């Protein structure tokens, strides 16, 4: 991408031992998939240890996390549908991977990920349709983003 970069950024994912070694050997960043803050912390720690062994570094702010969110509550059909998807795909509890509530709940989850070592985030809105997803995204931009910037200072 422009401007021309000496090294193409390569963010890798995965939490297995081979994925951790690959990230340490080749990555310029790491992006969690559906891991919780409690699951992310040991992976980031293991990557950092593997980086020492590889005599490499990854910028301290090149560790990412992801979760789905909904300004609303767990009883809403859109949230129930998302929870069923996570349950079916992961065969694990969906609650730690979804935040349904208000700005405070979303910010609390971001803060948990920051405490675990993540500093970049992919937040996926849960919605019934395109209009709903746009509305959820707008709320995130207006209500959460300004506060997240404060968390990172």
List the predicted regions and their residue ranges:
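Active-site-adjacent structural elements that line small-molecule/cofactor binding pockets in enzymes
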Residues: 1-153
């Amino acid at each position: 991408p422009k401007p021309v970069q000496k090294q193409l950024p390569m963010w890798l994912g995965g939490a297995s031992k081979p994925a951790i070694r690959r990230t340490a050997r080749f990555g310029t960043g790491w992006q969690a998939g559906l891991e919780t803050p409690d699951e992310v912390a040991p992976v980031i720690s293991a990557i950092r240890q593997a980086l020492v062994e590889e005599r490499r570094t990854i910028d301290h702010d090149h560790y990412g996390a992801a979760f789905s969110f909904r300004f609303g509550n767990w009883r809403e059909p859109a949230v129930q549908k998302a929870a069923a998807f996570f349950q079916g795909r992961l065969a694990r509890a969906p609650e730690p991977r979804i935040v349904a509530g208000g700005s405070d709940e979303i910010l609390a989850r971001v803060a948990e990920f920051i405490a675990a070592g993540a500093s970049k985030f992919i937040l996926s809105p849960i919605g019934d349709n395109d209009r709903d997803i746009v509305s959820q995204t707008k709320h995130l931009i207006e209500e959460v983003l300004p506060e997240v910037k404060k968390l990172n200072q």
